[in-house]
């Protein structure tokens, strides 16, 4: 199998509290890794370390063989995208503008091309009728899928999902499961944080347990 991410001895603490220590993990293209642990144990912090938003106390992360500290941060966050629990959608923008703003600002894509790319994914995710809706007009499941689409538009090879099924009903959870399955089949690697262990067991081929002062366990 071909490695895309190597995490070596990753450790992070806040003050005297160790969140996680000596986490070792190798990820191949298309792997789906689940992270479970008690609330406040550092699962989201772990995700932020992986895409360079937070520096670990020690340890190393390699993306396609290169230390992430040596990769341009703008490029790194396109290669390793993150979907936060609260989705981080701009409430004053409609869906199509939420999806195209980064394409235009970061990738310098013109408006027509950006909108064509966004509409293509909206159709694929059965959300084309929502392109002019605002975030407060969307259901939780729709907001989640819009946030995933926005990340996909940047062309990531790794996607980090923070509690992707929180507050979703069974139907929307199943839709998220299908999305994860398809992304994995397309060789996109996923790291998923969730408090729902049954969901993690269903979607993941590797599981890490993170707790206060615990080592990561696969």
Q: Model-flagged regions — what are they?
A:
Residues 51:
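Helix-to-loop junction immediately C-terminal to a conserved catalytic motif
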């Amino acid at each position: 199998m071909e490695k895309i991410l190597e995490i070596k001895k990753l450790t992070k603490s806040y003050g005297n509290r160790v969140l996680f220590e000596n986490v070792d993990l190798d990820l191949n293209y298309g792997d789906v890794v689940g992270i479970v642990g008690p609330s406040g144990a550092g699962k989201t912090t772990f995700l932020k370390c992986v895409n360079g938003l937070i520096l670990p106390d020690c340890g190393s992360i390699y993306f396609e063989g290169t230390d992430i500290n040596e990769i341009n941060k703008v490029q790194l966050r396109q290669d390793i995208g993150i979907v936060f629990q609260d989705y981080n959608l701009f409430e004053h923008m409609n869906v199509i503008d939420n999806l195209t703003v980064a394409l235009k600002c970061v990738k310098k894509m013109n408006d027509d091309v950006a909108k064509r790319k966004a509409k293509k994914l909206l159709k694929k995710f059965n959300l084309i009728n929502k392109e002019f809706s605002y975030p407060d007009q969307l259901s939780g499941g729709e907001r989640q899928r819009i946030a995933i689409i926005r990340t996909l538009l940047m062309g990531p090879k790794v996607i980090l999902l923070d509690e992707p099924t929180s507050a979703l009903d069974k139907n929307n959870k199943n839709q998220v499961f299908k999305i994860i399955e398809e992304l994995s089949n397309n060789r996109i690697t996923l790291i998923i944080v969730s408090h729902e262990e049954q969901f993690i067991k269903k979607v993941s081929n590797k599981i890490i347990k993170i707790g206060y002062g615990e080592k990561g366990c696969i």
